[in-house]
Amino acid sequence: RGLGDVYKRQEYVLRYLISASGLSDDAVTLEFKSEASEVAAVLAEDPNAIGLLPQPFVTAAIAQNDSLSVVLDLTKVWDSLQEDGSNSRLVTGVSIVNNEFLAAHKDLVDTFLTEHEASIAYTAADPEGAAALIEKAGIVAKAAIAQKALPACNITYLDGQDMKDALNGYLSVLLSQNPQSVGGSLPEDDFYYLQ
């Protein structure tokens, strides 16, 4: 089951948010860059440009260019568009394992998930300590940038039915934009590992 090109999925999410906000595709011209640094360069050169960057690149770009500011949080926009009690979330990262590996190493997978959840809890409880580890691991060049970015990263851990509902809603949006982006249909229940 292919999930399509990662950059196309980002475009589908953006187009969904634009459309759901009442704008037509014709009202917005999208230009994609392959690196966050390219977007930051365009923003530095053109004061009328609008850029879309993920964290921590937003925080790093603002630190280098004080004329930049955050005007939209896509997670908040996504959440505001979810009606009828939908638990859909703007999912940007998941842990995936194939069924053979899961069957052979269920305890290992469960341990990984438990430690992953603990890591996220640690990051929320001690952003300064987490930022130092993030810098040490080379994920972000400076701990100060990581620490400033962490609250806006929306790092969460979901499992069980909450995870399934959040991801299924997200995949439904991708399906509506381009069915092939999710392999032609929504995944069956056995796609999800409900611990």
Write out the residue ranges for each language-model feature.
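Pocket-lining segment of extracytoplasmic ligand-binding domains
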Residues: E38-L133
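Short, small-residue-biased leader/transition segments that mark boundaries at the very start
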Residues: G2-Y7
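Ligand-binding cleft/hinge of the Venus flytrap
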Residues: Q10-F32, A41, P47, A60-S67, ...
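Secondary-structure end/capping motifs
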Residues: L102-Q177
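Short glycine-enriched loops at secondary-structure junctions
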Residues: K8, L74-W78, G138
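Conserved C-terminal helix/tail region of periplasmic/extracytoplasmic solute-binding proteins
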Residues: N168-Q195
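Short, surface-exposed acidic
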Residues: D25-T29, G138-A149, S181-E188
